[in-house]
Amino acid sequence: MSLAGAAFAATACAANAHHSIAMFDRDHPVEVVGIVQEYRFSSPHAFIFLEVKGADARPVIWRLEGNNPNSLTWDGWSNKTLKPGDEVRLMIEPLRSGAPGGAWTPKKATFKDGRPIVVAH
């Protein structure tokens, strides 16, 4: 293999690893309800840090990854969509490891009272 070929292969593997969704259990989505602690609308991916009551009723912070801001904007999200203290209900694809986290589905996100977080345009 040439040096250029090896460099391309290494770059392609790194890019694929960055964009991999293998860590999320897409076959078993779950709903989480909690209080937004932090909302980051930044590249390369947006994040919601959500305080959720654990099995023992103690708060656990879930780290939820979203799409990139450009994709989220097309779904109606912005840097002002959520703020700390908002109570939300999110459909997520949980981490396969069982750690408190996952990927949230922007079109299946509501405030705790059932109002949609964003209205489709």
Give the residues covered by each predicted segment.
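Short boundary/loop segments of OB/S1/cold-shock single-stranded nucleic-acid-binding domains
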Residues: 16-30
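A short macromolecule-binding patch
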Residues: 55-67
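Short, structured beta-strand/loop micro-motifs enriched in basic residues and often containing a Trp
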Residues: 66-74
